[in-house]
């Protein structure tokens, strides 16, 4: 295998034998790739900096099998997210999502979007409500890039526009986990949203979090937890694996409520 240079985000790092580590890296060029990092478990190793949530520049190569990291340089570390359980769970959930979305092929824009949302988690780490809201929005952005976006504009049964009638509190839409949102209460719905909840969810496809005129985040924590549940259900159904990290985030926030 030819020697090459890669820049990417370390999504996951685990043990490999007695002294090595196995690195899962997200890059623009290759999507998610796995590399052996020889000697990285030795304290004085020059490769010991291969840690989760670090942006790395690597030189990799190898004759056959699992490619090996020859050299690495840390460009940026998001390791501070591990200091609080909420941000750790949020970051882990986003890393797991990237692994699922880019395991087979590169996804254009995924690395840049992931970095952006990790930066926002760092910025908001002292505010659990913003961590929760930012995680929900990040998941929606990543799912959309990966081809699994929530269909938020039309009813999955009738094709009619999903236009939540704000103030009409008896109106409901239902999440049918395989298909999307349907107007009215539907049998077999995984969860139902009222008009303001759906309107808030629809705004999360935009670049910034929805805020009121005074700059405060729109929506109370209970609503954001429901939107997190929507993301959990959709991801589990379409990626065929539940997110333990999202569940941990939800439970952690509930415990602190």
Swiss-Prot record:
A Gene Ontology term for the protein's cellular component: bacterial nucleoid
UniProt KW keywords: DNA damage, DNA recombination, DNA repair
Keyword DNA repair: yes
Keyword flag Oxidoreductase: no
Recorded superkingdom: Bacteria
GO biological process, one term: double-strand break repair
Function comment: Involved in DNA repair and RecF pathway recombination.
NCBIfam families noted in UniProt: reco
Name of the protein: DNA repair protein RecO
């Amino acid at each position: 295998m030819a020697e090459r240079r890669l820049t990417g985000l370390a999504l996951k790092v685990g043990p490999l034998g007695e002294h090595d580590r196995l690195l899962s890296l997200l890059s623009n060029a290759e999507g998610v790739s796995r590399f052996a990092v020889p000697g990285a478990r030795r304290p004085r190793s020059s490769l010991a900096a291969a840690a989760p949530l670090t942006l790395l520049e690597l030189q990799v190569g190898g004759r056959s099998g699992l490619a090996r990291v020859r050299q690495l340089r840390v460009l940026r570390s998001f390791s501070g997210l591990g200091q609080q359980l909420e941000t750790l769970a949020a970051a882990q959930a986003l890393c797991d999502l990237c692994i699922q979305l880019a395991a087979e092929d590169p996804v254009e824009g995924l690395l840049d979007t992931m970095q952006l949302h990790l930066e926002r988690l760092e910025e908001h780490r002292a505010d659990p409500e913003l961590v929760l809201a930012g995680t929900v929005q990040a998941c929606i952005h990543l799912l959309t890039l990966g081809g699994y976006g929530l269909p938020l504009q039309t009813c999955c049964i009738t094709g009619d526009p999903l236009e939540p009638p704000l103030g009409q509190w008896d109106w409901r839409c239902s999440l049918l986990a395989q298909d999307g949102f349907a107007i009215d209460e539907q049998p077999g719905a995984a969860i139902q949203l009222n008009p303001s909840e759906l309107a808030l969810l629809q705004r999360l496809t935009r670049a910034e979090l929805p805020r009121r005129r005074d700059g405060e985040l729109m929506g109370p924590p209970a609503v954001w937890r429901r939107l997190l549940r929507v993301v959990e259900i959709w991801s589990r159904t379409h990626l065929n694996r539940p997110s333990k990290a999202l569940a941990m985030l939800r439970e952690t926030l509930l415990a602190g409520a």
